């Protein structure tokens, strides 16, 4: 394959993204789970790595609390659809768990470049790839154990495959892009179902248009994409049946009965249920956080987006509008979910990140007088007009430098030891003297849940690790639990007194 100079630069940016994400995972998040979601994903991944979707519920299930891992009819299983846990489980099985999201980060940057190159030309593709690489929003999520980097790759791959075969002006007769489009959207549905609906929506409108106005061959490809993605998405129903015994029982509702998409009583935590007022508050705050975390330019991360939209409309670039519509669709559809997500930026919109980086790249190129269409020639300027691109480069350089020197380091540092959870919390159990106590049941007496949650990094779902950790439920329940593990010594642990193990509850506790 012949690579252009721009392709090689994009490849370097993609490799830098892998390195940057790995460093964030290692230096900021210390390769341990912090969010409840991450803990649950790891639990599922470890179970799947050994071939299990469900496990028998342990004795005293509340003692072995794992967030978002459900006990139902004597079985224990995670509430999340299988897409991301399976991929993470492959990483666990191969011993490369900590590399999965960094590798996906690099692939996400590469696919963003490919989308930009296809729709707007190499210059915009490189701008979008560079903006992605320097985005605090991108770096935080790429260093996490969350599903969003996988979702971004699937979303971008779907958009690229759709445009390869069905985009305006496409003449490709090949079946491969059709298969890839169906598979990637279907896998996204197996990973983040509501996100898949939102990502697919702009393309669904285009697909309906093609069904009415396209030739028979085009219609076949549209129907094939829809059929493949729906067939894969329907596997969620089989998974629900496998773990709950009911095709239509969503495991989310077994943890919180109100954890559903929709409005009214029974949706969300308020008595009256989710409503448009709450939706507006959530959305507004998500966007407020988002336009700071997007590029780290303070309140001005959005500054080039209007010019990008203007350029797309002037050039009547309908492919660009479709791709740009992904983030708008995500914002619109997540109005129907009762809670927002802000700690890692507005991560429910993450799978549409390329919409924002591409449109920002188009805006920059448009203002600088650079090409914003594939194969468009570079214009030469004379006189004062020569200052136009130089001024844009200077402004962009200033913004990116300010982000990399100030905003991103501060933002990432704010995530270190999130919720007070650090790898140092595990050290009391890794000393030679502690290892001599194993195998042991450790009953944890935490001041807050996170003091217990961080220790789950040393435990697996099968409870066959040197130490297994139980959340104290009171002296009687703790004693009964200890009797269920006669082959293990029992110790009581107080996180505010590390390196000290008690053979019974501490005096005065």
Annotated model-derived regions:
Residues 107-110, 206-207, 213, 284-324:
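Hydrophobic, aromatic-rich transmembrane alpha-helices
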Residues 161-170, 175, 197-238:
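Perimembrane helix-loop-helix junctions
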Residues 1-24, 211-228, 302-305, 320-321:
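Start-transfer (signal-anchor) and selected internal transmembrane alpha helices
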Residues 41-42, 141-142, 148, 191, ...:
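Hydrophobic/aromatic-rich transmembrane helices and adjacent perimembrane loops
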Residues 8-15, 200, 204, 226-230, ...:
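Signature aromatic-anchored transmembrane alpha helix within multi-pass, membrane-resident enzymes
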Residues 10-14, 110-135, 152-153, 169-176, ...:
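Transmembrane-helix signature of polytopic, membrane-embedded enzymes
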Residues 36-39, 99-107, 123-162, 175-178, ...:
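Multi-pass, polyprenyl lipid-linked donor-dependent membrane glycosyltransferases
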Residues 87, 117-120, 158-180, 188, ...:
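Membrane-interface transmembrane helices that cradle and orient dolichyl/undecaprenyl
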